[in-house]
């Protein structure tokens, strides 16, 4: 058995996912074969493995940090909320069922053996596994059936580091309270604390660190500053906290409508890092102005979010903006909303609903989920805005339930040449006759650097601006540089040698 280490948090969004990615990068740099693991992830941001299996985006970007191919064993249970009370349960990359919170809480014990087996299968292929918890281990109302925090650490006998976020205030109370609520054996498993997101003079923090170490008996292994490093977010917290407000004006203004059940908003990270793009997430009709491009993102509740668009006034505002010449792109659920009609029987109690009518297309939902990685190219002779994108290569993945049938006034967008490694010929998406409205089922569309730059230059041309002359930003390469910056910062601010000692000493102490 190799080494293992688990990061748990005093709360959600304390930075566990990013720190796990950083540790994976460090261990790989130090010559270890390393993989991430999170037994249960609740998120609407997901991706597809090379085998067509669905898993959380957080474990995908952690695998990227480790320089390895994402493997569904890294995230055996994925919960995707479909409403305020219900979630779709994805087991080992495939949809199993939908449950409410009470049903799932009763169901969890039956998953323990499978999760344990999956972990050991993964661990047998690597030198180090870095586990991530969820929320806080001090959720005492959920402890008896826990499979993701201390319950998981006990299953595989992993030492734990506790991550606390100082930016939100009350960091010492959060550390002390969390440790106080743990059982004695659980507290003994916590080998150190990481204080995250610090701003200011660390000397002012030192007296508090000394006191919390004395009070708890647990050492603080470092204080991570607030970093200007751009990495993917696990869930919608970043949207709620205004990370993507787009305060700085740029040559192009792109707005994404922040649907209540927005899914895979990481689709647009590649746009956010472009030097000439201001990306904004909006929830009010007035915020659509000024826009050079409006994007309708994916949704886990397409009909519910379409109703919300109409009730909120955003549907009318979008149609008005389009009539004034603003192009519109829809991705997955957003693509479906742009059509004439959606026929359901799967997602909600609504049998059918009229779409926004911007594309001559009808969508019919199905029970079977499509989960594929795809490669392809923009089709020849695309009209309007997309004329600059002809034959540009496209890579991405599909996650959807249903299919769309195009009418005479719509043309396909993308020629898919490969699905899950199998060659063939398929068409994806739709474009209207004028080339001002387009949609696709492909997530990660804007990660295709040449396509994205061609599209952005077409938008620049519409505004009378010259084409961007700088280097084309490759988002995949960009992420790799961010992982290296993260690892460098963690080496500077954390006691990495002591973290190694925690893992090795714990393993030695566990050997009979």
UniProtKB/Swiss-Prot annotation:
Which residue range or ranges hold the GATase cobBQ-type domain? 251-451
Q: Which PROSITE patterns match?
A: GATASE_COBBQ
Please name the catalytic residues of this protein.
332 (nucleophile), 443
A molecular function (GO) held by this record is: catalytic activity
Keywords assigned: Cobalamin biosynthesis, Glutamine amidotransferase
The record's annotation in InterPro entries points to: Class_I_gatase-like, CobQ/CobB/MinD/ParA_Nub-bd_dom, CobQ_GATase1, CobQ_N, CobQ_synth, GATase_3, P-loop_NTPase
Pathway named in the protein's UniProt entry: Cofactor biosynthesis; adenosylcobalamin biosynthesis
A single GO BP term for this record reads: cobalamin biosynthetic process
Q: Which domain of life is it from?
A: Bacteria
Return the Gene3D superfamilies for the record: 3.40.50.880, P-loop containing nucleotide triphosphate hydrolases
According to its UniProt record, what is one Pfam family this protein matches?
A: CbiA
What family classification does the UniProt entry report for this protein?
A: Belongs to the CobB/CobQ family. CobQ subfamily.
What does this chain do?
Catalyzes amidations at positions B, D, E, and G on adenosylcobyrinic A,C-diamide. NH(2) groups are provided by glutamine, and one molecule of ATP is hydrogenolyzed for each amidation.
HAMAP family in UniProt: CobQ (MF_00028)
Task: Indicate what this protein is called per its UniProt record.
Answer: Cobyric acid synthase
What is the organism field in this record?
Answer: Photorhabdus laumondii subsp. laumondii (strain DSM 15139 / CIP 105565 / TT01)
Gene it is expressed from = cobQ
